[in-house]
Amino acid sequence: MKYLSAILEEKRREVEALKRQNPSARYRDVASSLPSCRGFARALQGEGGSIRLIAEVKKASPSRGVIVEDFDPVRIALAYEALGASALSVLTDRHFFQGSAGYLQQVAAAVSLPVLRKDFIIDELQIFESRIMGADAILLIVAALEPSELHDYLQMAGEIGLDVLVEVHDRHELALAIESGAEVVGVNNRNLKDFSVDPATSASLRPYFPSGVIAVSESGLKTADDIALVRDAGFDAVLIGEGLQVSSELRSLSWPNA
């Protein structure tokens, strides 16, 4: 997992710097005193077989470099809200994705939709930080955490009102997510070894989701056929970033909230 290892190494340095500046107990107290979040998990539940859209506000990626040169996160977020998205995802990783906490804060203030903080969370301080910056949900990546950390971080997030999207790549990680109590699980179609993508990854794992767990397909969804594939496999939602930026076909689909 070459890409993930490099990202986590950089993230550990960032977290250590954050810890030197801000005690975790102080962050926890502030996060616990904030008003209720907008329900991320609730927004992904629907009837009638429609698949929900989590639209990602994304400037760049390690595999593609800069995707949007004239990047205006609020303009993009408002366009996605008008498109019919049920929730938004905002990249906050600076080093690899050119994101920022400021982007999430701006977006959360501008829209009525729940907002997911998309980053590599490896420490409890980041969970409290996410709540303070305005996130309604966070991403936890099974491949980046020990099983005990995954369990504990899910519990911590719930205690301060955050929903959690738990990301998996295979059956083993899916089992760990379920055992840890995940209620929303995303299958990442991207291979973390080489960053190649295959939407069929989601379809192959869907039969192993227990009833009641919200299923999300992530990454590499670029055509209406890709959406149909995961919809027909029984997914509740899709998370799309780059695809919405480059594909008019995806933007023209009829999303439930439009």
Curated annotation (Swiss-Prot):
Belongs to the TrpC family. It comes from Chlorobium phaeovibrioides (strain DSM 265 / 1930). HAMAP family: IGPS_B. Keywords: Amino-acid biosynthesis, Aromatic amino acid biosynthesis, Decarboxylase, Lyase, Tryptophan biosynthesis. PANTHER family: INDOLE-3-GLYCEROL-PHOSPHATE SYNTHASE (PTHR22854:SF2), TRYPTOPHAN BIOSYNTHESIS PROTEIN (PTHR22854). It is an enzyme of class 4 (lyase). Gene3D superfamilies: Aldolase class I. It comes from the Bacteria. One of its GO terms (molecular function) is indole-3-glycerol-phosphate synthase activity. Its EC number is 4.1.1.48. Pathway: Amino-acid biosynthesis; L-tryptophan biosynthesis; L-tryptophan from chorismate: step 4/5. It catalyses: 1-(2-carboxyphenylamino)-1-deoxy-D-ribulose 5-phosphate + H(+) = (1S,2R)-1-C-(indol-3-yl)glycerol 3-phosphate + CO2 + H2O. One of its GO terms (biological process) is L-tryptophan biosynthetic process. This is Indole-3-glycerol phosphate synthase.
